[in-house]
């Protein structure tokens, strides 16, 4: 293969396509290898469609590949509303996210988000870009949030907090086929939290220094995805090592601080049972820590993404796990012009989890629920509504919230 000619690529640089299709033009031509790389490139979010043809080159034994690339839309906007926040700062809220792909022409991705509820606001921004044709990716992300307690009886004493984080991530795909993807990487994470009472710094958690805690963490990440037409399996493992660097909070003597070791494991499996039987979704998370942790790094349990039927962050501890099984049954499906589907599904599920600090019995703080849900998926709108019954009864609250009745919902508009 002596040459690859790319057309229709717009701002996407031709080298982005050619280096992934055939990085070594001197290598012997292999149709099967080219086809696999072609199909892998079709999975790239920058590309909507590709058409190619091979013709003889100028010299005997040479071939030229003509490629016509149709780019995917390089920008987008999502607006979401839900009740997936802790009631103490206002569970009802919204978030808007704008994103832009390929700003430089080298496959980078830029996104900015802003979210707010009655007592909270947050800003999040990230930029990632590819370092080479092997898709080694470097990314940076910054987030900042302000929170005020708006729930009685604590609202009147003016409790506030600020959180800030900055992450730098380097990830490389070590093995990639049309079915499998194995990635490993490292993250340097800087996180800081400040808490205030009546406008004055105040410590509410063990390990804080005058209302302030700070961690510098090295995270080693491994992820694996196995995907076919009938199932998808995603596994992720994160080893976190708290470092005594960059003014991290360090005490010693058994007091929670930023010098620690912890492991977080995450798994999700989805299996299509058949066109009329729907799908089965299994999920699980677990965190184990060798030491007492600052609140910044603890495991949060309860709410829409862990154990439904309870308040968001019902339990916050050093260690914890949650598992979930959900069956989704299709009620109605329709295909519209342009090939986009509309799907309405009913769901039934069961969630279970536990969280504990070092030295505590893991079974003393259990959350267990079962319930029903309704899900809508379409090109422009996704919506979820879940109701769950708390089998392990939650403690009564003075201020009522929808989450106390096991109601969790989310609506997302895509543009």
Where are these regions (language model features)?
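Periplasmic polypeptide-binding modules associated with outer-membrane biogenesis and secretion
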Residues: 1-85, 113-122, 283-286
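Transmembrane beta-barrel outer-membrane domains
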Residues: 45, 60, 87-91, 116-122, ...
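Flexible, solvent-exposed coil segments and beta strand-coil junctions
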Residues: 47, 72-78, 102-108, 145-152, ...
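Repeated loop/turn-to-beta-strand initiation elements of outer-membrane beta-barrel proteins
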Residues: 75-77, 104-110, 133-139, 147-148, ...
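Transmembrane beta-strand segments that form the barrel wall of outer-membrane beta-barrel proteins
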Residues: 75-85, 96-102, 106-118, 123-125, ...
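Feature captures outer-membrane beta-barrel proteins of Gram-negative bacteria and organelles
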Residues: 94-103, 121-142, 164-173, 218-226, ...
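Transmembrane beta-strand segments of outer-membrane beta-barrel domains in Gram-negative
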Residues: 137-293
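C-terminal transmembrane beta-barrel domains of outer membrane proteins
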Residues: 239, 250-415
């Amino acid at each position: 293969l002596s040459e690859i000619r790319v057309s229709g690529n717009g701002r996407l640089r031709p080298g982005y396509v050619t280096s992934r299709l055939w990085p070594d033009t001197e290598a012997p031509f292999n149709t099967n290898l080219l086809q696999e790389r072609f199909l892998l490139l079709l999975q790239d979010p920058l590309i909507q469609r590709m058409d190619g043809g091979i013709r003889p080159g100028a010299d005997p034994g040479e071939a030229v590949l003509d490629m016509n690339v149709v780019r995917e839309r390089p920008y987008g906007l999502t607006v979401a509303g839900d009740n997936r926040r802790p009631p103490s700062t206002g569970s009802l809220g919204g978030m808007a996210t704008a994103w832009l792909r390929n700003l430089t022409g080298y496959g980078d991705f830029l996104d900015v988000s802003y979210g707010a509820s009655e007592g909270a606001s947050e800003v999040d921004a990230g930029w990632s870009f590819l370092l080479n044709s092997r898709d080694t990716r470097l990314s940076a992300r910054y987030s900042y949030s302000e929170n005020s307690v708006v729930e009685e009886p604590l609202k009147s004493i003016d409790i506030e907090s600020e959180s800030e984080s900055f992450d730098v991530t380097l990830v490389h795909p070590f093995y990639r086929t049309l079915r499998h993807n194995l990635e490993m990487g490292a993250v340097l994470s800087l996180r800081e939290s400040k808490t205030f009472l009546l406008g004055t710094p105040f410590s509410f958690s063990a390990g804080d220094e005058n209302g302030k805690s700070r961690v510098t963490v090295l995270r080693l990440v491994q992820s694996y995805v196995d995907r076919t037409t009938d199932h998808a399996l995603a596994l992720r493992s994160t080893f976190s090592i708290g470092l005594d660097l960059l003014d991290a909070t360090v005490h010693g003597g058994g007091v929670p601080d930023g010098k620690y070791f912890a492991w977080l494991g995450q798994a999700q499996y989805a299996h299509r049972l058949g066109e009329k039987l729907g799908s089965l979704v299994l999920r699980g998370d677990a965190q184990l820590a060798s030491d007492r942790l600052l609140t910044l790094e603890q495991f949060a349990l309860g709410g829409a993404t862990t154990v439904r039927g309870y308040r968001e962050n019902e339990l916050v501890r050093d260690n914890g796990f949650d598992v979930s099984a959900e069956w989704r049954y299709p009620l109605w499906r329709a295909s519209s012009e342009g090939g986009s589907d509309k799907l309405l599904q009913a769901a039934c599920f069961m969630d279970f989890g536990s969280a504990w600090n070092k030295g505590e019995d893991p079974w003393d703080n259990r959350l267990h629920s079962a319930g029903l849900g309704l899900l809508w998926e379409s090109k422009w709108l996704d919506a979820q509504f879940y109701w769950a019954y708390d089998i392990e009864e939650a403690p009564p609250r003075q201020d009522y919230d929808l989450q106390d009745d096991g109601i969790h919902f989310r609506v997302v508009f895509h543009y």
